[in-house]
Amino acid sequence: MQKKALNYCVSLLLLGCAATPAIAADLSIGDPKTDLGELKLSGFLRVKYQDKSWTENDHKLTFDAARINLDYTSPKIFGHLEYRCYQYNKLCDFSTLVDANVGYNINDSHLIQAGLQPVPFGPGRFWESNYYGGVITQIGLEDVHNVGLKYQGKFDTGTQVELAYFTGDGGSYSGPYSEDASRYTTNFVKPEDSSLTHLDEQNMFIGRVKQEIRSLPEPMKGNIGASYWQSDIENKTNGQTGDRQAWAVFGNVSYNNLGFGLTLGKNEMDNKDPLTPKTSLMGSFDDNFMVANEGMFYTADVSYKFKNVGKLDAVMPYAMYSSYVKSEDGYDDSSRNLLGVAAYYKNMSFVAEYIMGKNDFLIGGPSSSYAQGGDDDTHELLNLQFYYNF
């Protein structure tokens, strides 16, 4: 009942923001340089038009999603809240909390942060330039938000260190289809089929180190880094405890408006499940799916931003390759590749993406896509989006 009430309030707030574009240009009070700080409201409203190769479409422009950010900034204390809602059948029938955290600036170079926040694994929250995301998002390693405590330090050598401990995931929220997969982040979820094992990830120790490459000639910039993930996986069905160990190495290079990023790593999970020892049940965005417990992952991204193109502020074409190469013999690899372009004009964004997926549950694949696979076809999605940012 409380989640439904929160969902209703968010819907009203979003409609209010959409109806007042003049006010939405500056929804803030206070000054971030003073002890009282600044409180700022921001977000977006998004509509979409999609064409899918694997199913018939109604080809209608529909409301897709909305995001609300509430940020508090002061010299010492800061906080961040992000809430999103999506439309499946009706306005905001799936909604979820993404972030809710507070932090303390020890000084200009060191801080601590507590609450529901992004996990410091891989090059950043997002590993690519596009708006749809890579296939590793569904494996539960990219754009992950869990509950815990993080330390971040920046040093004169150009080194950034992040050390974090997460007690567990951010929980489930409100959706029309699934009891436990109504969440933004891909986590282990409670099965709706009683024959499947219920897993829960806890005690996550995660670290990331980034190093600026200062020897590059101007105007090149770049960094390299590595991250590691160690956690317990509680098998709630038989009471045993397994673990996850994952690592990633990454690098990013830019030359003026050209950017390139590469991430690779390995995911290895022991679920202590005699029934399905090679796969585990995970879920997000109101869907459940099985994921192979062991595999290598790869993401490559390239983009170029053209500034001041006619009346547009910028136009950015981009491309992505992402794959999950499973270690188990006979398992088909999962891949998602993308070509896209984004155009920006004042507080509006226009996005066009052509996405190709193979053994990708979100792009026409079966529910076993991220586990055994079994689909020899490549499916395509044309994804057109319009954003109003406030």
Model-assigned labels for residue ranges:
Residues 68-72, 100-104, 149-153, 207-211, ...:
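Residues on the lipid-exposed face of transmembrane beta-strands in outer-membrane beta-barrel proteins
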Residues 30-51, 55-173, 210-216, 299:
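Outer membrane beta-barrel
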Residues 207-213, 217-327, 388:
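Detector for outer-membrane/organellar transmembrane beta-barrel domains
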Residues 39-45, 79-81, 112, 161-163, ...:
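Transmembrane beta-strands of outer-membrane beta-barrel proteins
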Residues 47-53, 65-67, 74-78, 83-89, ...:
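Transmembrane beta-strands of outer-membrane beta-barrel pores
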Residues 37, 57-66, 94-98, 143-147, ...:
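Residues that define the transmembrane beta-barrel architecture of outer-membrane proteins
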Residues 346-390:
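Predominantly the C-terminal beta-signal and adjacent terminal strand-loop region
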Residues 171-196, 236-238, 269-291, 360-376:
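Solvent-exposed loop segments that connect transmembrane elements
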